[in-house]
Regions:
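Secondary-structure boundary/capping micro-motif
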Residues: 1-133
Length: 133
């Protein structure tokens, strides 16, 4: 996902580094939900950003049917950086998220890394799944 808004990039680059490390993922929640005006069940997709050190959920959002996940991911990252500064690093688990966030992170000086283990994030996702059951 290429970021073309240079004013946005400059504004974010001016934000201080906050020293935080974040975990970011877009898991499907394995609990089927009924969809309005349809007989098909859907598995909701959660976009969740966690502080890897505190541990705390910084933002979470259920992606709606038909909504572009790229817009959701970039919106969450931009909002975080504008409100709390640029994190020292962001850990993601999959190539899709890496591809969406890669250009923004590169242009704003934020390290983006793959990590198969996102312990804090997985703890919160498990808690959300348990609430559905």
């Amino acid at each position: 996902c290429v970021i073309t808004d240079e004013l946005l990039v400059r504004r974010i680059r001016k934000k201080p580094l906050n020293g935080r490390y974040l975990e970011f993922d877009m898991p499907y929640i394995p609990v089927p939900l009924e969809r309005e005006r349809s007989d098909r069940r859907v598995y909701p997709r959660l976009c969740i950003l966690c502080d890897a050190e505190r541990p705390a959920v910084e933002n979470q959002y259920f992606i709606q049917h038909g909504e572009d996940p790229r817009d959701v991911v970039l919106g969450i990252l931009v909002n975080y950086m504008e409100e709390k500064g640029r994190p020292a690093g962001i850990y993601v688990r999959d190539a899709e998220l890496f591809g969406i966030a890669g250009d923004l992170c590169a242009k704003t000086g934020v390290a983006l890394s793959f990590s198969p283990m996102l312990k804090v994030l997985d703890f919160f996702v498990e808690d959300i799944i348990n609430q559905f059951n």
